[in-house]
């Protein structure tokens, strides 16, 4: 009897144990379901952008350009000229890093908080760099796993205001003329107009740059025998300028007084009045003086002030091409000539504004009056301003 009681007790205990396990199994199943739900919620946040941090401000300017821009005054760039070092203006990329392990990830960057019109970049590596952002701009970013749909939270960052330099293989002295603020509180749009040296010997990468940025028009400011239409196979338009080419910044207002050079300048300015011509790349031989003159006139016309216009010109001296035609020992004399040239150009346009007898003469009004007297129409000027700044 004692043995049968013991066996009965053991059997009952086993039955209770199995029943308990069965019930526990049911709870475990529910727990797994809840856990999966929690994992799914965690997974959405399992991939995150580590850098840039939320609300970070990043600079697209390298340290040298930052130093020039800080507390800039006309002539400052001459203190940094070093011909032996070649191009030193190249932009900094924005570095992004993420969590999430290996996989087919995509980085999305948009200027809209709802991530509409986002540009997509490969983010398969845990670190990637982006080099085609605008300066002085608010951005939003997120990362998504292309296979699972796993997506990070949206993160905000801004880029610092300043010149937007670009790197184009096979040429030099290249940058966007946008990003500058006007006296009216507007900002010149970026991605529409680029300036630089001649594109006669571009690398394959340089040619890809023109494709990537969708350049539709190239304005060659050189004299006729020097002009080469090396990218016409890409369907790029080359407007015809007078044989003598365009006015030259380094000669101040003297070249603008030259009838043929003035005609070249006016012809080039008119190209900017037609929205179908954008994006535009304009150049001379080394991208400094004739190119600098046109940049001065276009940005001055939309309201950029003299100091920023001279900064844009002086950035040429951080490039290989911008220093080709003088020796390092001649830097000081070049600096003095530069002062005379820039002030001569400024004074010439201010005379046009003063001649209108307005209460507050300005460079913007002076350039406008100069252009009107030489064949550019009111409608063309209005169009240029609207295209480049949104001014109505």
Give residue ranges: language-model regions.
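Bacterial N-terminal signal peptides that target proteins for export
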Residues: 1-10
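C-terminal motif of bacterial Sec signal peptides marking the signal peptidase cleavage site
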Residues: 17-20
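Ser/Thr-glycine-rich phosphate-binding loops at phosphate-binding pockets of nucleotides
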Residues: 286, 290-291
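Cys-dependent protein tyrosine phosphatase-like superfamily
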Residues: 22-281, 294-392
């Amino acid at each position: 009897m004692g043995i049968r009681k013991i066996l009965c007790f053991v059997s009952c205990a086993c039955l209770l144990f199995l029943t308990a396990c069965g019930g526990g199994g049911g709870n475990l199943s529910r727990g797994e379901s809840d856990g999966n739900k929690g994992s799914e919620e965690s997974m959405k946040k399992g991939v995150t952008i580590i850098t840039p941090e939320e609300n970070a401000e990043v600079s697209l300017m390298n340290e040298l350009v930052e130093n020039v821009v800080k507390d800039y005054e006309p002539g400052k760039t001459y203190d940094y000229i070093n011909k032996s070092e070649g191009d030193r203006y190249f932009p900094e990329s924005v570095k992004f890093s993420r969590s999430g392990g290996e996989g087919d990830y995509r980085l999305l960057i948009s200027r809209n908080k709802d991530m509409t019109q986002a540009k997509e970049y490969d983010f398969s590596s845990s670190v990637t760099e982006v080099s085609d952002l605008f300066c002085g701009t608010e951005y939003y970013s997120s990362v998504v796993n292309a296979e699972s749909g796993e997506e990070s939270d949206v993160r905000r960052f801004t880029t610092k205001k300043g010149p937007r330099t670009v790197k184009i293989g096979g040429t030099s002295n290249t940058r966007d003329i946008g990003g500058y603020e006007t006296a009216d509180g507007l900002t010149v749009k970026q991605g529409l107009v680029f300036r630089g040296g001649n594109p006669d010997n571009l690398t394959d990468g340089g040619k890809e740059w023109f494709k990537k940025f969708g350049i539709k028009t190239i304005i060659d400011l050189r004299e006729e025998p020097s002009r080469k239409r090396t990218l016409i196979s890409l369907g790029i338009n080359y407007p015809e300028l007078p044989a003598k080419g365009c006015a030259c910044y380094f000669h101040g207002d003297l070249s603008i007084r030259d009838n043929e050079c003035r005609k070249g300048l006016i012809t080039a300015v008119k190209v900017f009045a037609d929205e179908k011509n954008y994006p535009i790349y304009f150049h001379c031989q080394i991208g400094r003086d004739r190119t600098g003159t046109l940049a001065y006139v276009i940005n001055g016309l939309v309201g950029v002030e003299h100091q920023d216009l001279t900064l844009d010109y002086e950035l040429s001296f951080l490039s290989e091409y911008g220093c080709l035609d003088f020796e390092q020992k001649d830097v000081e004399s070049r600096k003095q000539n530069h002062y005379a040239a820039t002030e001569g150009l400024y004074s010439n346009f201010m005379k046009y504004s003063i001649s209108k007898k307005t209460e507050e003469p300005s460079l913007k009004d002076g350039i406008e009056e100069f252009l009107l007297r030489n064949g550019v129409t009111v409608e063309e000027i209005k169009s240029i301003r609207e295209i480049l700044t949104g001014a109505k």
